Amino acid sequence: MAALALFVMTAWSVGAVDTTITADTLTYNGNEDTAQAKGNVVITRGTAKMTGTEGLYRFADQSATLSGGVSYVDGATSLTAATVTAYADQSLAASGGVEMHADDRTLRGATITYRPSDGYGTIDGNAYLAVPGTEMTAGHVEAYVNEIRMIGTGGVSLSHPEQAFAATADAITYTQTPGADDGFAVLTGNAHAVQNGNTLNGPALEVRLKEQAVETKGRSTLVIRGGQ
């Protein structure tokens, strides 16, 4: 018991930063080189902090998995989920009602992976991604949220209320310069776009939101709202 108590109270070095695990019960498995934590688990690594009800730390790859109402916070990044795995490079894999905030970006889905070093993330299962002024929903979203570049596939919708723009397609790629209102969307497969009440349908559309300019690809239909 004395050795276990010392283990609970002591931080150990992991690469360039220290990792500390605190819990009601900690068990070290020398054969598997893991530490299992149960009850009011708190894991800190550098500036990051995770809390949950049960956790497992793997010394081999320096990864930590927490489950049970998990909360993760690191600076301007926060995440809640049923289960979260944090890796040595600070990347995250979360599942179960995941909601994440990174600065002014919001991500939601059944599962989310995120890499803070370059802002790359994936969202699966009722995927939702919001960046300033624009929202995307899809079955799957792949994005670089720092530079605002996202690709949605599977029943995708995109909206920009300030530009009175809404669209749906099988796949949508959207890019925007951070801090600028220069959104550009490429819609492919059953593309449908509405801006200021005017509707365009076609196999593919390219939309520059601020200029309210649309280029069609293939045979398309434009429906102009009455009075315009």
What are these regions, as identified by a protein language model?
Residues 1-228:
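Mature-chain termini and adjacent capping regions
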